[in-house]
Amino acid sequence: MSAPGSSCTEPGPPLWLLAELTYRCPLQCPYCSNPLDFARHGAELSTAEWIEVFRQARELGAAQLGFSGGEPLVRQDLSELIGAARGLGYYTNLITSGIGLSEARIAEFATAGLDHIQVSFQAADAELNDLLAGSGKAFARKLAMARAVKAQGYPMVLNFVTHRHNIDAIERIIELCLELEADYIELATCQFYGWAELNRAGLLPTRAQLERAERITNQWREKLAAQGHPCKLIFVTPDYYEERPKACMGGWASLFLDIAPDGTALPCHNARMLPVQFPNVREHSLRHIWYDSFGFNRFRGDDWLPEPCRSCDEKGRDFGGCRCQAFLLTGDAEATDPVCAKSAHHGLILDARRQAEEAPLGLERLVHRNARTSEIICRSRSE
């Protein structure tokens, strides 16, 4: 089934499955991609329910399984879930803050069959890291766990979400990652969804900051290549400084399948913000969800595209851009992504750039992600 969204051919399998095991998290990062109203979402899937999700997704062709959150380490059944995924033949990776990790759990995960670990940091110094995380001593714990991950022999990605308050320390960030023997360094400039969108005025870097950071990253790439160093640097820019939108997730429901903690199935991490009814694995099979559900077919292909996207010769590359970003900025999920210079709403992006230059919010005004604030947001929306 391809309707209602498009005339596209039958979609391929969901190759990448992301299991958002929980929205619970010990940290309070102001750029978290979790929904603002996470406090209102229902009970988490049980161990047995998650394993059934893994089984069904594997039958559909999923090959890679990421364990995410929130903080997936708060799930006491994580080792069991890893073992079940390994038994089904997945390549598995754990995406974690490192808080709640221990040498014993790292060894336990290795025994269960975990393939890969990504550890996130907030900054390259303890004071800023812990301020952004909303947790004292988080930095010291992260350092210890990154070293323990390497000692266990895992391939390790160190991830830094960069923004206006830490991006100027990009060189120190890279140096720290090399000291910790990272195999990959992901320098991911903040993407503005969830809590990051709420705090955009305090997080969006200036163009000059981004250009400097990218220049330094490229210099380090050249230096490491000349040394024959195996570490790879990945630099992700925000599309707020582009004139064409990103091809979000490689196209709506084309290869990525996200399962939220309560079992809601989504074509991307942020799609539950949209005015679209998405199915739940407690009520439908993954085969039905992926191939036949309204939500997953809503923006597949290109029949749904408005002008100027419909007649644009670039629509096969960007698919009209990000539906979540279009909705966040315009209130219309079908609108052309305002990042695109051809969009009638591109002025919203230009305004955001100007604000980053002229009137950014200070670090002290960032709203931290936590259950109490989420509950306040939920109440305000219901009034």
From Swiss-Prot:
Domain Radical SAM core as annotated: residue spans:
11-226
Positions binding [4Fe-4S] cluster in this chain are C25, C29, C32
Q: Which stretches are transmembrane?
A: none
> Matching InterPro entries, A to Z?
4Fe4S-binding_SPASM_dom, Aldolase_TIM, Elp3/MiaA/NifB-like_rSAM, MoaA_NifB_PqqE_Fe-S-bd_CS, PQQ_synth_PqqE_bac, PqqE-like, Radical_SAM_PqqE_MftC-like, rSAM
Key words, A-Z: 4Fe-4S, Iron, Iron-sulfur, Metal-binding, Oxidoreductase, PQQ biosynthesis, S-adenosyl-L-methionine
Q: What is its EC number?
A: 1.21.98.4
This protein's record includes keyword S-adenosyl-L-methionine: yes
Tell me, what is one Gene Ontology molecular-function annotation carried by this entry? cyclase activity
Among SMART domains, the record links this protein to:
Elp3 (SM00729)
The record describes its quaternary structure and partners as: Interacts with PqqD. The interaction is necessary for activity of PqqE.
- What task does this protein carry out? Catalyzes the cross-linking of a glutamate residue and a tyrosine residue in the PqqA protein as part of the biosynthesis of pyrroloquinoline quinone (PQQ).
Output this protein's name: PqqA peptide cyclase
Question: To which species is this protein native?
Answer: Azotobacter vinelandii (strain DJ / ATCC BAA-1303)
